Curated annotation (Swiss-Prot):
Its EC number is 2.1.3.6. PANTHER family: ORNITHINE CARBAMOYLTRANSFERASE, MITOCHONDRIAL (PTHR45753), ORNITHINE TRANSCARBAMYLASE, MITOCHONDRIAL (PTHR45753:SF3). InterPro entries: Asp/Orn_carbamoyltranf_P-bd, Asp/Orn_carbamoylTrfase, Asp/Orn_carbamoylTrfase_sf, Asp_carbamoyltransf_Asp/Orn-bd, Orn/put_carbamltrans, PtcA. Pfam families: OTCace, OTCace_N. Keywords: Cytoplasm, Polyamine biosynthesis, Transferase. Pathway: Amine and polyamine biosynthesis; putrescine biosynthesis via agmatine pathway; putrescine from N-carbamoylputrescine (transferase route): step 1/1. The keyword Cell wall biogenesis/degradation does not apply. The record marks K28, E144 as: Important for structural integrity. Gene3D superfamilies: Aspartate/ornithine carbamoyltransferase (3.40.50.1370). This is Putrescine carbamoyltransferase. NCBIfam families: orni_carb_tr, PRK00779.1, putr_carbamoyl.
């Protein structure tokens, strides 16, 4: 079966994303019940990092270990990637040795090239364009915190601030799943027109919507989720932090005043790390409506789902046939249930 990469969620259907959401939650519940299904037994993940990382690296390593696999950390300087050896050659070699590759890169072209030449699945751990593993973790988190009586497609999410790769990814996932997406940000820091078109096309298919605005009342009206990111990103070198502060503060700081404009049941999200006192106040990030810690935990939930989905072709075959999907889902559920019962009996 043709290998699949997880480089851009726009190459996946809404149904495939929903399947990964459900798969991630199901595995998470199994582990919380004490059973670690060996779905990645004898599989090895190679992790290429051109940048430092906390959540991405630890969640990927833990996901592989918990499901019976192994992860190798490939730091800058430890491997040849576009240096003395071409990306093509390195990718082909790693594809012969590893079962799956994850790459956190400076430029999106790099991970796209790795995906092109490696014969194994490649996962984008973040580029200057998007952050798809964050996308899946976020949509899982929103699924777990849906307002009473609402589906994802009934919800509105507001991204506050700069059009970072996390902002772009939030638009991609929200519009893919039929949500209403709003970016509340200043001119010059809004999603680029060519990228915006992708979100608009997603929304046209799913029934969602995309809005870019500088009007706080318009942005936050009836919002179910508020999301923000740092104002000084990894890839921004044109302006100093001081200059960016003048643009974003105080209008685009998520504080109690802004939150009060949203719905009564609104939840706050942040991909982390957060610069407290800048893009968000302590009062908001530490509030009872903040779900940032669940969001961080679900980075691992997402990694499990992605790795299992890509390394188990029968899951992808199930997408083509509801009958096969139902059969596999029933067998998987029975396996987990029996394993948990066996573990309890052993205890």
């Amino acid at each position: 079966m043709t290998k699949r990469d997880f480089i851009d969620t726009n190459t996946y259907t809404k149904e495939e994303i929903q399947y990964m959401i459900d798969l991630g939650i199901k595995i998470k519940e199994s582990i919380k019940n004490g059973y670690y299904p060996p779905l990645l037994k004898n599989k090895t993940l190679g992790m290429i990092f051109e940048q430092s990382s906390t959540r991405t690296r630890t969640s990927a390593e833990a996901a592989m270990t918990e499901l019976g696999g192994h992860a190798q950390y490939l730091a800058p300087g430890q491997i040849q990637l576009g240096g003395h050896e071409t990306i093509e050659d390195t990718s082909q070699v790693l594809g012969r040795i590893l079962d799956i590759i994850g790459a956190r890169v400076e430029r999106h072209h790099t991970v796209a090239e790795v995906g092109k030449f490696a014969k194994v699945p490649v996962v984008n751990f973040m580029s200057d364009y998007n952050h798809p593993t964050q996308e899946l973790g976020d949509i899982i988190t929103m699924t777990e915190h849906l307002p009473k009586g609402k589906k994802l497609s009934d919800c509105k999410i507001v991204f506050v601030g700069d059009a970072t790769q996390v902002c772009v990814s939030t638009m991609f996932m929200a519009t893919k799943m039929g949500m209403d997406f709003v970016q509340f940000g200043p001119k010059g820091f809004q999603i680029k027109p060519e990228t915006l078109k992708i979100g608009q096309q997603n929304a046209k298919v799913s029934g969602g919507s995309v809005t870019i605005t500088e009007d706080a009342d318009e942005a936050f009206k009836d919002a179910d989720f508020i999301y923000t990111d740092v104002w000084y990103g990894l890839y921004e070198a044109e302006l100093s932090e001081e200059d960016r502060m003048k643009i974003f503060y105080p209008k685009y700081q998520v504080n109690a005043e802004l939150v009060a404009k949203a719905s009564d049941h609104v939840k706050f999200m942040h991909c982390l790390p957060a610069t407290r006192g800048e893009e968000v106040t302590d009062e908001v990030i530490d509030s009872d409506y903040s779900i940032v810690w669940d969001e961080a935990e679900n980075r691992k939930t997402a990694m499990r789902a992605i790795f299992v989905y890509l390394l188990n072709p029968e899951l992808r075959k199930a997408q083509a046939s509801q009958a096969v999907a139902d059969k596999y889902d029933a067998e998987f559920s029975l396996m987990l249930r029996n394993a948990v019962d066996d573990q309890r009996n052993a205890d």
